[in-house]
């Protein structure tokens, strides 16, 4: 299963035609197993300004499984990830990224993103990161 991060979904919903957006479209068309987390769901929806677009976006997102943060251990793991990054001189700008990473690690899923925070986290934690296939730009 591939968890698609907010950074990729935003490009998708805006029709940005970035490499990530276009690749997500291909993954959807191919019927790949995609998901998101409850925090990603919230991040995407909070950025939608218009009511009609909010509802369309919400309905689209609800087509995919939503992994939920239910275990206190996930929050503790996120704190440990943040502390490890800081100790190694890596800046993680958003705690929410540590939470998403901790849940992806706990659920043993791959994260498709375009956020430098996750690259930093993957350097110190066993976060599986989805990479665009070679030749995709």
PLM regions: where:
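A general structural signal for well-ordered alpha-helical segments in protein cores
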Residues: 21, 41, 54, 75-78, ...
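Generic structural signal for small/hydrophobic residues in well-ordered secondary structure
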Residues: 5-6, 44, 78, 104
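Conserved glycosyltransferase catalytic-site signature
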Residues: 6, 38, 96-98
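Short, well-structured N-terminal submotif of metal-dependent ribonuclease cores
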Residues: 1-36, 46-59, 136-137
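Active-site neighborhoods of divalent-metal-dependent phosphate/nucleic-acid chemistry enzymes
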Residues: 66-112
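Acidic, PIN/NYN-like endoribonuclease modules and their adjacent C-terminal/linker elements
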Residues: 1, 101, 105-137
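Short beta-strand scaffold positions
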Residues: 4, 36, 69, 112-113
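A generic structural signal for short hydrophobic patches within well-formed alpha-helices
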Residues: 9-10, 41-44, 118
């Amino acid at each position: 299963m591939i968890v698609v991060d907010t950074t990729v979904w935003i490009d998708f919903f805006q029709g940005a035609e970035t490499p990530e957006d276009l690749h997500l479209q291909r993954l959807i068309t191919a019927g790949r197993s995609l998901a998101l987390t409850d925090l990603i769901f919230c991040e995407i929806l909070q950025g939608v300004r218009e009511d009609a677009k909010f509802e369309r976006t919400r309905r689209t997102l609800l087509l995919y499984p939503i992994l939920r943060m239910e275990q206190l251990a996930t929050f503790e793991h996120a704190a440990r990830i943040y502390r490890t990054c800081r100790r190694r001189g890596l800046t993680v700008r958003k705690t929410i990224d540590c939470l998403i990473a901790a849940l992806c690690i706990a659920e043993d899923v791959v994260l498709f993103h375009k956020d430098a925070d996750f690259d930093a986290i993957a350097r110190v934690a066993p976060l599986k990161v989805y990479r665009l296939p070679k030749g995709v730009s």
